[in-house]
Amino acid sequence: MAMLSFEKKYRVRGGTLIGGDLFDFWVGPFYVGIFGVMTVFFALIGIALIAWNTALGPTWNLWQISVNPPDAKYGLGFAPLAEGGIWQWVSICATGAFVTWALREVEICRKLGIGFHVPFAFSFAIFAYVTLVVIRPVLMGSWSYGFPYGIFTHLDWVSNTGYSYGQFHYNPAHMIAITFFFTTCLALALHGGLVLSALNPDRGEPVKSPEHENTVFRDLVGYSIGTIGIHRLGLFLALSAVFFSAVCMIISGPVLAEGGSWPDWWNWWRNLPIWNP
């Protein structure tokens, strides 16, 4: 892929966190870096382990392939590879790949002299993943509470986990997370629609400026958050959705015991004096 005209001046030495100039180069448009090499290493090992697990299993059907966590009897210890140990090592490799990818993003930001908003945002995705495969299982005392790596088995795990707490939609953190997800979609749709409207005026009309964009929302709702503000708001909404998604899993089991009911948890609300004078 050809280098764009402005890219060459940004391809400079330095900005690395460790390793100095080792792997401080580009392959085509992609910056490598020592963390890029580590990401590829973890990813390849993880993929190889998944292939090995599949070879041990009953099928090569893509929809039915699954790398399952260990049985509850192993607790937080290491399980034999064929009995969940592969899942443990795949989780280690996945975590390593995600973390080193984020550190690669940090190095790119340092080279460009920009803020670290991209790796900061990506770290929330890492937190959500680690919550599911490390934090929640550790709090519940067994790796068996991790989710399986498989298309259908993962969906089954989501369904079974939800119904094991009565009705997961009553989980308060789940409510907040879903609200942020929907609000993120609304904000992005409004922002995207507004920008495209300003860039696609009637034939013969000039492209509209941010002043026009601000005026649309001042006319519509009486206030415009501004061109920078909408991106800050979008980042906040998206990260909040991911954060509360992780929280809703952390409190399901460690806080509300397994077999408990989220609908029943709300009895404190129904029993408030304002409803029962």
From Swiss-Prot:
The chain crosses the membrane at residues 30-52, 84-106, 113-135, 173-195, 233-255. It is a multi-pass membrane protein. One of its GO terms (biological process) is photosynthetic electron transport in photosystem II. The keyword Transmembrane helix applies. GO terms for cellular component: plasma membrane light-harvesting complex; plasma membrane-derived chromatophore membrane. A ubiquinone binds at F217. Fe cation binds at H191, H231. GO terms for molecular function: bacteriochlorophyll binding; electron transporter, transferring electrons within the cyclic electron transport pathway of photosynthesis activity; metal ion binding. Pfam families: Photo_RC. Keywords: Bacteriochlorophyll, Chlorophyll, Chromophore, Electron transport, Iron, Magnesium, Membrane, Metal-binding, Photosynthesis, Reaction center, Transmembrane, Transmembrane helix, Transport. The keyword Ribosomal protein does not apply. Belongs to the reaction center PufL/M/PsbA/D family. Reaction center is composed of four bacteriochlorophylls, two bacteriopheophytins, two ubiquinones, one iron, and three highly hydrophobic polypeptide chains (designated L, M, and H). This is Reaction center protein L chain. The gene is pufL.
